[in-house]
């Protein structure tokens, strides 16, 4: 079985970065250690997942282009968005990692440092940006795979009608051109 890994892996960074964004916002509001560490763990896994999704997407892109019938502009936009998501996810990870390091090691005097609101704000902003970007990337990928809200994707069975009750013939004219 030659299963492309991209469709399998993509859901992990979407879930992890979106929940990580929520955890970062709660940390921003409360300053509680639990939420900082939760955001750090979620973004760590989400950034790795985003990188893996980007890498496997490269191979899938070649398969899709060989098959043809793909919207090249949308595919390119999805690819660019995925690359940007990886960058911002790792920037968010760095900011959260810095906050964790600072909280554990303390400030310049060696005393335990409290979470600075500025550090929390920057880390939360980057984490929420990564969550928004992964959502956009996922939306673009979903549009590539499943089509828009009103248009079926090329090669999909969307747009065909379900068999009616009784013996009436079923139309398989997907593009409504009469053939």
Please annotate each region the language model reported.
Residues 1-179:
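Polytopic transmembrane helical bundles with strong interfacial aromatic enrichment
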């Amino acid at each position: 079985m030659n299963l492309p890994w991209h469709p399998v892996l993509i859901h992990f960074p979407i879930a992890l970065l979106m929940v990580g964004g929520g955890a970062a916002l709660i940390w921003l509001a409360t300053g509680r250690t639990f939420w900082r560490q939760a955001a750090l763990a979620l973004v760590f896994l989400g950034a790795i997942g985003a990188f893996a999704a980007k890498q496997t997407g490269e191979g899938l892109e070649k398969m899709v282009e060989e098959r043809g019938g793909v919207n090249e502009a949308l595919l390119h936009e999805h690819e660019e968005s995925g690359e940007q998501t990886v960058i911002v996810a790792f920037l968010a990870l760095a900011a959260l990692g810095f906050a964790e390091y600072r909280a554990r090691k303390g400030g310049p005097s060696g005393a335990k440092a409290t979470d600075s609101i500025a550090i929390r704000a920057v880390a939360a902003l980057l984490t929420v940006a990564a969550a928004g970007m992964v959502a956009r990337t996922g939306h673009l990928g979903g549009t590539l795979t499943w089509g828009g809200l009103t248009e079926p994707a090329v090669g999909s069975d969307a747009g065909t009608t379900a068999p009616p009750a009784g013996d009436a013939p079923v139309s398989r004219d997907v593009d409504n051109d009469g053939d």
